[in-house]
Amino acid sequence: MNLHEFQAKHLFADYDIPIPQGYVARSSGEAVEAAGRLGGSVWVVKAQVHAGGRGKAGGVKVLKTKEEVEEFTDSLLGSRLVTHQTDAKGQPIHAVLVEQGLDIARELYLGALVDRASKRVTFMGSAAGGMDIEEVAASTPEKILTLAVDPAAGFQAYQGRKMAFALGLEGKQIGQLVKIMKSLYRIFEEKDLSMIEINPLIVTGDGQLLALDAKVNVDDNAVEIGRQPQIADMRDITQEDEAEVQAAEHNLNYITLDGNIGCMVNGAGLAMATMDVVNLHGGSPANFLDVGGGTTTERVTAAFKLILSSDTVEGILVNIFGGIVRCDVIAEGIIAAVKEVGVDVPVVVRLEGTNVEQGKQMLADSGMDLIPADDLTDAAKKVVAAVGKAA
């Protein structure tokens, strides 16, 4: 679960991490009022969306008059911001963050994530912070220092000093960074984060460190089981894929893709293998959908509705291995879904496992135009051919 920048900064403030003074605004009038409360003659207005690359995409601007603040805010609110991290539709903008303009001497990068190789929270830092950090990571990875934290010992001050030296900090700035990193580690542990990032972490003209931007990702599992009620209240579903939100309500694992063949599979591994085989035979999956092991007729019906909610789907491949879930239950769900939804695209069904013959017979007796398949390769070939024929 992602947080907006203003939400992440509120979290930072709770842990005494220095941030610029700013206010969130949901109208141009509120933005102008925020600029007045901040004072000064330079303000920064930032679109609040769950995506990086806002600056290069025109979602962040330095402004010098309140008229400019009003005009820029009006141009953002109600529109969609397309960045290199979004799809072609972009993300909707419902709020902006108005902050005071600052004297920036240096831009640094500081972040932390769960390193699955070392099984530890690992800090990353670079003296080359700012909008081009991704290019730095790709072309000159040696400019990024990584420090893994031993979970038994926790974050140690010497690690902060090592990072400070690598970033070229000096004097009181070293102590400031140690304090910031210690607070970041506390947030990471106490709020069940999977990633936290400050880009840029700036050095101001008077030598102070300040988190100019903030990106926070929280472990979905911690939110779902109720460990983080405060974080759960910050969720903004307008920034999430609508189909994926609906899938979560039915405990379905669903990810929207760019293809035209809908896939309904039980098991994440089998789902990925199914997509690979569809690609191998010239098709393009429209989604990843794992209906899970405890599948019911209702969940299968919900899965069909999700797949068909996409305008790009021209065919559906159902690939079920009946281990925990029985093939007759899947067949019952398919029949119910087709009757309720009114499927008008080719549907290829491959069943194998528990009660497979009973399931196949139910599909055959349904009188519906369902295409049976003997194995995964056969199923992939048939759905690709059916989609091509329909086109």
Curated annotation (Swiss-Prot):
Substrate binds at residues 266, 323-325. One of its GO terms (molecular function) is ATP binding. Mg(2+) binds at residues 199, 213. GO terms for biological process: succinyl-CoA metabolic process; tricarboxylic acid cycle. The keyword S-adenosyl-L-methionine does not apply. Residues 9-246 form the ATP-grasp domain. Binds 1 Mg(2+) ion per subunit. Its EC number is 6.2.1.5. Keywords: ATP-binding, Ligase, Magnesium, Metal-binding, Nucleotide-binding, Tricarboxylic acid cycle. InterPro entries: ATP-grasp, ATP-grasp_succ-CoA_synth-type, ATP_grasp_subdomain_1, Succ-CoA_synthase_bsu_CS, SUCC_ACL_C, Succ_CoA_ligase-like_bsu, Succinyl-CoA_synth-like. It is an enzyme of class 6 (ligase). One of its GO terms (cellular component) is cytosol. Its cofactor is Mg(2+). Pathway: Carbohydrate metabolism; tricarboxylic acid cycle; succinate from succinyl-CoA (ligase route): step 1/1. It catalyses: succinate + ATP + CoA = succinyl-CoA + ADP + phosphate; GTP + succinate + CoA = succinyl-CoA + GDP + phosphate. ATP binds at residues 46, 53-55, 99, 102, 107. Heterotetramer of two alpha and two beta subunits. Belongs to the succinate/malate CoA ligase beta subunit family. NCBIfam families: PRK00696.1, sucCoAbeta. Succinyl-CoA synthetase functions in the citric acid cycle (TCA), coupling the hydrolysis of succinyl-CoA to the synthesis of either ATP or GTP and thus represents the only step of substrate-level phosphorylation in the TCA. The beta subunit provides nucleotide specificity of the enzyme and binds the substrate succinate, while the binding sites for coenzyme A and phosphate are found in the alpha subunit. This is Succinate--CoA ligase [ADP-forming] subunit beta. The gene is sucC.
